[in-house]
């Protein structure tokens, strides 16, 4: 498990491109037959992936958590962005199709990942946050989620937000998770942009071709920077930072938030005329 420390906006505005990428970009997810995990000190979120091809992958706590098992004091959200796969939780097998999700509550001990077809393996994307109590484990189908259509083609930001884990739908201690899919011809996400000082966020960009990219904008509104994102790469966004992107084509991204509250609409809007 890789560890990432928190960074101050006073320091970040002086970072080079390489340093920005080193601190915030996660560019080595979805390795074949591996579970890859990145532990951020920002609200203690863990971001990761599991790609079982010809073997089952078992989730273990590792020394970093100092726990008997991974979810002893944590909860987890998962979205499958690959082929059909299974997640086995304490002996119960759940089958996940493409873009199906899973919430696993605190206290689940034995968790393993497998693919149904090794030639089209599952790609499980993982977010995990500290938890204080146990909520029920839920298999999540996107067609049963709250879906909100926003933006317009004229604004180049026509998109559908699919909310997987949030209060009133799938309960959690603090993790809020979902997916945003841009419509063809739209390239902007989260513009006009915002911050939310009560929560940090991680984005995973995918559904992109090899030569496509997203310019992910971050930093304080008056000190913006960008990181170029490729397919199936994630980026950590501190609570003080904007988080917005513009791609060469339409794309999809998964967002996961942890922090002080779970109010999706608790945002501090940025006036576009103030952006620099």
Curated annotation (Swiss-Prot):
InterPro entries, sorted: KduI (IPR007045), KduI/IolB_isomerase (IPR021120), KduI_N (IPR027449), RmlC-like_jellyroll (IPR014710), RmlC_Cupin_sf (IPR011051)
The protein's name: 4-deoxy-L-threo-5-hexosulose-uronate ketol-isomerase
GO biological process, one term: D-glucuronate catabolic process
Top-level taxon in the UniProt lineage: Bacteria
Its EC number(s): 5.3.1.17
Disulfide bonds: none
Gene Ontology molecular function terms on file: 4-deoxy-L-threo-5-hexosulose-uronate ketol-isomerase activity; zinc ion binding
Keywords in alphabetical order: Isomerase, Metal-binding, Zinc
Record's function text: Catalyzes the isomerization of 5-dehydro-4-deoxy-D-glucuronate to 3-deoxy-D-glycero-2,5-hexodiulosonate.
One Pfam family this sequence matches: KduI
Known catalytic reactions: 5-dehydro-4-deoxy-D-glucuronate = 3-deoxy-D-glycero-2,5-hexodiulosonate
Binding site for Zn(2+): 194, 196, 201, 243
Pathway the protein contributes to: Glycan metabolism; pectin degradation; 2-dehydro-3-deoxy-D-gluconate from pectin: step 4/5
Source organism per UniProt: Lachnoclostridium phytofermentans (strain ATCC 700394 / DSM 18823 / ISDg) (Clostridium phytofermentans)
């Amino acid at each position: 498990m890789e560890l990432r420390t928190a960074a101050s906006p006073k320091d970040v505005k002086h970072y080079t491109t390489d340093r920005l990428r080193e601190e915030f970009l996660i560019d080595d997810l979805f390795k074949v037959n591996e579970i890859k995990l990145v532990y951020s000190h920002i609200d203690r979120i863990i971001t990761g992936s599991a790609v079982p091809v010809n073997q089952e992958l078992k989730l273990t706590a590792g020394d970093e958590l100092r726990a008997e098992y991974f979810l002893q004091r944590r909860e987890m959200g998962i979205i499958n962005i690959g082929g059909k796969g299974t997640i086995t939780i304490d002996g119960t097998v759940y089958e996940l199709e493409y873009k199906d999700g899973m919430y696993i509550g605190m206290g689940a001990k034995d968790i393993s990942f497998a693919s149904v077809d090794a030639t089209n393996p599952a790609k499980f994307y993982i977010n995990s946050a500290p938890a204080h109590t146990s909520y029920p484990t839920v298999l999540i189908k996107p067609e049963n989620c709250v879906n909100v259509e926003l933006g317009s083609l004229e604004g180049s930001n026509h998109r559908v937000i699919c909310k997987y884990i949030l209060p009133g739908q799938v309960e959690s201690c603090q993790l809020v998770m979902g997916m945003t899919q841009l419509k063809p011809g739209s390239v902007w996400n989260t513009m006009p942009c915002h911050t939310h000082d009560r929560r940090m966020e991680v984005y995973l960009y995918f559904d992109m071709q090899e030569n496509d990219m997203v310019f992910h904008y971050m930093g304080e509104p008056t000190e913006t920077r960008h990181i170029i994102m490729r397919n199936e790469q994630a980026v950590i966004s501190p609570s003080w930072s904007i988080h917005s992107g513009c791609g060469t084509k339409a794309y999809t991204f998964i967002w996961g938030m942890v922090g002080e509250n779970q109010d999706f609409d608790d945002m501090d809007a940025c006036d576009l005329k103030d952006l620099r």
